[in-house]
């Protein structure tokens, strides 16, 4: 599901103006990004949590030339599914 599809579904389900739903979805995502960029964890009970994981510096490889490349350490977003989400998805199999 894309952001556009989510906005469309919410618009139809709750009979709200598309612009209002779009603004709300964008604001929710922006608040999550701001929290993560400040090093905070974002938890949505029953769904999951977003946090930052540190990737240590390492020597990578340029795929085009094969030459070694020094890669700096960095923080990357990480998502861990909540128990309820894992259980609901598990019933699909």
UniProtKB/Swiss-Prot annotation:
It comes from the Bacteria. GO terms for cellular component: chromosome; cytosol. InterPro entries: Hist_DNA-bd (IPR000119), Histone-like_DNA-bd_CS (IPR020816), IHF-like_DNA-bd_dom_sf (IPR010992), IHF_beta (IPR005685). Keywords: DNA recombination, DNA-binding, Transcription, Transcription regulation, Translation regulation. Pfam families: Bac_DNA_binding (PF00216). One of its GO terms (biological process) is regulation of translation. GO terms for molecular function: DNA binding; structural constituent of chromatin. Heterodimer of an alpha and a beta chain. This protein is one of the two subunits of integration host factor, a specific DNA-binding protein that functions in genetic recombination as well as in transcriptional and translational control. HAMAP family: IHF_beta. NCBIfam families: hip (TIGR00988), PRK00199.1 (NF001222). Belongs to the bacterial histone-like protein family. This is Integration host factor subunit beta.
């Amino acid at each position: 599901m894309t952001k556009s599809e989510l906005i469309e579904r919410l618009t139809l389900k709750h009979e709200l103006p598309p612009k209002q739903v779009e603004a709300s979805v964008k604001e929710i995502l922006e608040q999550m990004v701001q929290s993560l960029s400040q090093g905070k964890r974002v938890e949505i009970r029953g769904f999951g949590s977003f946090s930052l994981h540190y990737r240590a510096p390492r020597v990578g490889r340029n795929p085009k030339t094969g030459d070694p490349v020094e890669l700096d350490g960095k923080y990357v977003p990480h998502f861990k599914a909540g128990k309820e989400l894992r259980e609901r998805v598990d019933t699909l199999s």
